[in-house]
């Protein structure tokens, strides 16, 4: 489950991912502030990455941590879980939180409403994307060269 905050005049928290949304809707006080999309196809996912005000990634079990990097490509600031591989992949371009702490997640989201913090992480985001992407290309070239030599 991934929350998105779209760049609109009245921001909404957009949540994607295959999940039982009825459980969440039942406990939400301000239902108009949330949009549950469930699973989305890659084109819609790309639209969300590109048009988000911020990307919040409370993952507990991420193998590589690529979703935050996808948002960084577009200069979208990210708040993400400080667990698994995410800090290794995202470096200092992300505001980290404990994914088990609702108050930490909320505090990071509120921090991104501060213009200075927002601008700082919006500037870091595409730089980190380029670093990760460049490293991936170099690793792929190395693997291809190794295979071709065998």
Predicted regions and their residues:
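Carbohydrate transferase catalytic cores enriched for Leloir-type hexosyltransferases
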Residues: 1-150
